[in-house]
Amino acid sequence: MRVTAANQHQYDTDLLETLAQRVMVGDGAMGTQLQDAELTLDDFRGLEGCNEILNETRPDVLETIHRRYFEAGADLVETNTFGCNLSNLGDYDIADKIRDLSQRGTVIARRVADELTTPDHKRYVLGSMGPGTKLPTLGHTEYRVVRDAYTESALGMLDGGADAVLVETCQDLLQLKAAVLGSRRAMTQAGRHIPVFVHVTVETTGTMLLGSEIGAALAAVEPLGVDMIGLNCATGPAEMSEHLRHLSKHARIPVSVMPNAGLPVLGAKGAEYPLQPDELAEALAGFIAEFGLSLVGGCCGTTPDHIREVAAAVARCNDGTVPRGERHVTYEPSVSSLYTAIPFAQKPSVLMIGERTNANGSKVFREAMIAEDYQKCLDIAKDQTRGGAHLLDLCVDYVGRNGVADMKALAGRLATVSTLPIMLDSTEIPVLQAGLEHLGGRCVINSVNYEDGDGPESRFVKTMELVAEHGAAVVALTIDEQGQARTVEKKVEVAERLINDITSNWGVDKSAILIDCLTFTIATGQEESRKDGIETIDAIRELKKRHPAVQTTLGLSNISFGLNPSARQVLNSVFLHECQEAGLDSAIVHASKILPINRIPEEQRQAALDLVYDRRREGYDPLQKLMWLFKGVSSPSSKETREAELAKLPLFDRLAQRIVDGERNGLDVDLDEAMTQKPPLAIINENLLDGMKTVGELFGSGQMQLPFVLQSAEVMKAAVAYLEPHMEKSDCDFGKGLAKGRIVLATVKGDVHDIGKNLVDIILSNNGYEVVNLGIKQPITNILEVAEDKSADVVGMSGLLVKSTVIMKENLEEMNTRGVAEKFPVLLGGAALTRSYVENDLAEVYEGEVHYARDAFEGLKLMDTIMSAKRGEALAPGSPESLAAEADRNKETERKARHERSKRIAVQRKAAEEPVEVPERSDVPSDVEVPAPPFWGSRIIKGLAVADYTGFLDERALFLGQWGLRGVRGGAGPSYEDLVQTEGRPRLRYWLDRLSTYGVLAYAAVVYGYFPAVSEDNDIVVLAEPRPDAEQRYRFTFPRQQRGRFLCIADFIRSRDLATERSEVDVLPFQLVTMGQPIADFVGELFVSNSYRDYLEVHGIGVQLTEALAEYWHRRIREELKFSGNRTMSADDPEAVEDYFKLGYRGARFAFGYGACPDLEDRIKMMELLQPERIGVTISEELQLHPEQSTDAFVLHHPAAKYFNV
């Protein structure tokens, strides 16, 4: 066990030794048994519902319950003290009895435990501490009040003889900390130390009540020195598995679980718990085998009968009949907010610690704090989050201010508002303490040093007392009694002293120490400061070489003090890069002000490097060079500079530029001024639409990315909405698009995808067209009815599925039949379409005009051309538009000629082909070992931690494919890599934080299973039982290639003949994953509210998170499938995540409707096998999954299985 300041004492019990030797069994529910005890109101002394008073009035009843659980096989029972806390007993006006009732309850359990203890079977008592009814994080009560009440309760338990304290059903991390530290204080007072166990409660939403992910709970709890962590209450075992998996994989202490007997259902007697004793025992035995648990038991709805079955199952684990899983812990040193954990390691980058929430470093923050404008302070914190910070440095120290009051006000608010952990930065011990008492997550303390020594009254000792008690991480500055260390040797010497002191005397892990090697400005020109940059870099390198587990950090911006803002930005960025190369782990910095190294002009970068490394030479001083390069240059990224540039433009040019820039600030003022000079409709047609035209040109030339296009459309929409109330009624028709034309848009029947169609809607409607957006799954009948009713000029159809291309062809044929082809030109778009298919094949089918629109701006161009022709507007000969139209016509003529030539060649080749004999089976090896599945049938998984599967998110698919972040060609603008750093990853981090906080990502779920199967020719047969002669449940038929290797999916499953010969069938896994309906609803709300860029980004995240979850679960299946010798299928997995996207693992995952398995009807059979309605997924008549962010597949384990087409 890890030694910390909290647990370096000797325990007065052998409980932990017993836990290390075998799996132990806890008891079940107390409340359920009390309800069956036929107690009267007199038994409760009129305090109905106060179970703790029974410790005084009916100890006999409690003794009986404890005895039943022990006799059922429990090793430990919990005391009847769950509500012995200030809020519960305070509600009955008996808060003064906390210690007394805690002692009485413990004595009762102790008496029964001692009575039933034998030499072969010792019985133990856990002192139960519940959460109470008031949550300190939400300000219901104060931390110290809660902590002190828990101290009283723990003193009673120690007096009564408890073997350990169990802090259970924790809903608030700050309440949890109060209970743990209150218990530790009681042990110090009593002079008796016992272990402390913690059980957190994760709701069906996948987080604790206040939104904490399991990773946040672990990061906050483990450093407090607790001896075991686990889960209890709220759900049954099925909903707990993923959270247990996280604890098993990452906790360095024992893990336990006490689930409810399932989720309650409404029965004849009210709410009932459905899980039967054998079902609970089976689930817990599975957890022991999979997660290596140390303690299992039951919570609500469980009885002695449940515990009897559990004890029997655990006995089989302990005697080796059933294997107990081995835990392979991957420790990730982290800090946490209330909501999420942030690892110190942020490779390949560094941990960015936002510096703007600092009263000494930010004038704006300081003034807001002094004015008690806390909302502005919080907005600054949010800006740091959006800017890419991982932590927030919070400093309220300012002369003349009450730092404790300021810290309480800000830390208390940030606790619930910020998803980022907090670094508490103060020289005042009471201020640091106030922060720690308002933040339940694991904080960083900034900082300690030896400036006034390390004596008992030194600030070092006083600060470390807080660090050790609260389990915080700590920044340690290389300062000793002689002052700040400036040379490599001195920095390393002081760092060694700090590391040895903090680990040996305070029990803090090396991984929780952030050594600041200090940096000083190198911009003064003074000789003694010229080498300071080199000394810091070399000290970091040497320190990481000696102590790789120790974190390193820097207050980065000190290096550039004295330079102008733009020069500072460059020097800070270059210095950070050099420090990072030397091993720097984190930096206190304004993250959005750091430039990617490849975006800094070479001359500036070289001057900064020369300054850092003091490369002066005759006639060359890099400091002077850098100052000369930035003379009179202000920071190009500052808002103030951009506003000043806009202000210089003429009014109407400025309005158009605001559209191009997507800049809404100042828009209303400009529009008001513009309306004094021309009518609103003229402003729209002559100026705002000019801006949108420029946006289209920039997008078409690759100089503007799709997210910024949508930002421009948002501003256009806002401008039109602002002008509409000032228009004449007839002019308001612009809002309906009558000035330019009308299009009816729809996603075709059977297709639920609408992102592309909605982007077309956004671009067309903000360029003067009326768009009638019918939504998804629209039959042609409805499309044409609306087109006729609205007198549409054009019909637009979209679809993502391959099947949708067939539907589009059928729709065009129907339009021919109805005689409307000449009336309605048609625009077609969608991922499955190609230009060739539309302009050649479909153009032959349709009797009117049909056009392919690759994207929204091509759709706009086509609309302009169609409407110009309808209005009889001829293009001026020789004009750019006329020349472009002529070029398009020539290209179309060439394409059609090529198409006709290709068709003739294809017909000739087919006629010349000789018949090929297709074999019954391909050359795929049939004699491969079949892995053993962990179970047969299906299981559901809920409550998945977002952090578990975001590692499988394909960034390139998101940033390039979904968001359209494309670098500018020819070096005339940011590259794709630049955009990833400046836009992609910061926006992704922002959205993941925001969506997690809103609870939108809490509904991710999986249903998956393993099914016995054999192959017969081109069929895979799923069997009712894992026997070759078992009955058929379902049969899937797949096509076979007619040339080449003659592959068929059935070839990758063991044949029935071989299965019969070996008496062993094959295994066919199926999986279905979903992100749930809330993210789809959230996306829809963004579209309706005209938040176009947000709409694009969140939709893309939803799609790619679904794919990430599918990839993650596919890996889980490979981990669970084991071959002889206990070798898992995942042993062949690649190390790099990127290789997963290149299928760099064994086997493959196939989805019906694509490639080698084109029959989408087979999805019905898979749905019947998996029953995904249990996780909220249904299938439509068109065989589409709902919610949209869902995907399904079957998995082939065969090593030769790869994707192929038929």
Curated annotation (Swiss-Prot):
Positions bound to S-adenosyl-L-methionine:
954, 1149, 1203-1204
Q: Name one GO cellular component term.
A: cytosol
- Positions binding methylcob(III)alamin in this chain are 750-754, 798, 856
What's its EC? 2.1.1.13
EC primary class: transferase
| Keyword Zinc assigned | yes
Q: Name one GO molecular function term.
A: cobalamin binding
Domain named Pterin-binding is located at 350-609
Can you give the residue ranges of the Hcy-binding domain?
Answer: 1-314
Q: Which UniProt keywords apply?
A: Amino-acid biosynthesis, Cobalamin, Cobalt, Metal-binding, Methionine biosynthesis, Methyltransferase, Repeat, S-adenosyl-L-methionine, Transferase, Zinc
Residues the entry annotates as binding Zn(2+): 233, 299-300
Cofactor: how bound: Binds 1 zinc ion per subunit.
Database matches in SMART domains:
B12-binding_2
Q: Where is the AdoMet activation domain?
A: 907-1206
The pathway is: Amino-acid biosynthesis; L-methionine biosynthesis via de novo pathway; L-methionine from L-homocysteine (MetH route): step 1/1
Q: What is this protein called?
A: Methionine synthase
Q: Whose protein is this, by species?
A: Mycobacterium leprae (strain TN)
Lineage of this protein's species? Bacteria, Bacillati, Actinomycetota, Actinomycetes, Mycobacteriales
